[in-house]
């Protein structure tokens, strides 16, 4: 019946399954990196990156950008690659800021995509889908990070791989769906 179909998609938006997968991959990589580099400076710098992304998203050109998620993922990938390159003072300041900025930019773009793919009456379902996938991905990332704490480089390689897969998926989604609606914050 019609009432049963509403009950089935109350917590998860089926049309947003690929977007939810991308969100879970992004937050899983965040969880892995956060568990491998657990210092106050690193975590504070990631939060500063989140804040800078929130400020940048007030600029319409960034908020409505078609490949904002791919750009955010690329920034996070660059941050992880530079963490691999060599250890220096920037490992606890600038690199995590870049990582946090990229993760926040990409995650917010995915939320806008979820909200844009639903009807007005399904906005709370889209938000539930976002939080289920982001919290689930973060949990899996933290669990994987704690399992891999003895091998920091391999944990970061896994996080890097997750971000690459997320970038490919979100870029393909944008290329397949040529017409993208304006986002509303």
Regions found by a protein language model. Give the residues of each.
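Flexible interhelical linker loops that connect adjacent transmembrane helices
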Residues: 1-22, 183
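Extracytoplasmic gate region of multi-pass secondary transporters
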Residues: 13-51
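Transmembrane alpha-helices of Major Facilitator/SLC transporters
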Residues: 42-65, 69-72
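Small-residue-mediated transmembrane helix hinge/kink sites in multi-pass secondary transporters
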Residues: 57-59, 112, 142-147
């Amino acid at each position: 019946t019609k009432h049963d179909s509403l009950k089935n998609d109350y917590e998860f938006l089926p049309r947003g399954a690929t977007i939810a997968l991308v969100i879970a991959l992004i937050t899983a990589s965040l969880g892995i990196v956060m568990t491998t580099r657990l210092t106050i400076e690193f975590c504070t710098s990631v939060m500063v990156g989140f804040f800078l992304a929130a400020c940048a998203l007030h600029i319409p050109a960034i908020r409505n950008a078609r490949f904002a998620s791919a750009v955010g993922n690329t920034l996070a990938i660059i941050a992880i690659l530079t963490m691999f390159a060599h250890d220096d003072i920037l490992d606890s300041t600038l690199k995590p800021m870049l990582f946090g900025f990229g993760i926040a930019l990409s995650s917010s773009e995915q939320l806008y995509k979820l909200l844009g793919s639903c009807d007005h009456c399904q906005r709370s379902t889209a938000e539930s889908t976002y939080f289920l996938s982001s919290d689930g991905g973060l949990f899996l990332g933290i669990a994987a990070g704690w399992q891999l704490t003895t091998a920091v480089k391999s944990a970061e390689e896994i996080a890097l791989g997750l971000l690459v897969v997320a970038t490919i998926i979100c870029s393909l989604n944008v290329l397949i769906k040529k017409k993208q609606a304006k986002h509303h914050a």
